Amino acid sequence: MTSLLVHTYPSLVKGILIKRYKRFFADIQLDNGELITAHCANTGPMTDVCVEGQPVYLSRSDNPKRKLAYTWEMIQLGETWVGVNTNLPNQVVKNALLQGVFPDLVKNETEVRSEVAYGQNNGSRIDFLLTHGDNSLTYIEVKNTTWNQGETALFPDTVTTRGQKHLQELMALLPAAEAIMLYFINRGDCYRFAPGDSKDTKYGQLLRQAVAKGVKVLPCRFQVTPTGIYYLGLAELQL
């Protein structure tokens, strides 16, 4: 399919990653030689992505209340830019839903809501709840995916009890509603998607169980560039 622009970055600042530490902080040397500390929104291990000495791009906020003006947006690995700002995928997916990028999901008179309470005693929040014109419901959970092995994107890159819980909750929605797990592949060099069994065996087992029960999996490919993010279509699902 033709790539579709789904997010435009503001003017970004280029630098080199010196180090990432305490999960939230990244020291960056800007192209002008200045050494700054940027906010890292990704609190996970960033397996094989957090490579010191690689080119990065940062966004800059003019909000005087922020302790760190810069946010780390992406890193270059080989010829590929990889998105590392985990605050973006849900925003991008919502815009894509509203723009009709996923026509099979958003039909006429579909209402799109974010962060809706659901699950046992409404103790969880689904990333997106779609209410269609016929009152049918579609629940969508989004997972950011940056770890790869060759041309295969993998999730998770560490043990995630939270992710396991999300799969169980999606299964519990069936058959009364449609349940979707959307993997946001935040790099353009992956054409396949598979569960990261070597990092979390139970998650892989639950994902296969969920698919067998009727949970739909959408491994969505995105190309990240210094100017914007493009939707490339679906990756091949390998279970």
From Swiss-Prot:
GO MF entries: DNA binding
One Pfam family here: SfsA
Domain of life of the native organism: Bacteria
Family recorded in the similarity comment: Belongs to the SfsA family.
PANTHER family hit by this protein: SUGAR FERMENTATION STIMULATION PROTEIN A
Protein name, entry field: Sugar fermentation stimulation protein homolog
Biological classification of the source: Bacteria, Bacillati, Cyanobacteriota, Cyanophyceae, Oscillatoriophycideae
The gene coding this protein: sfsA
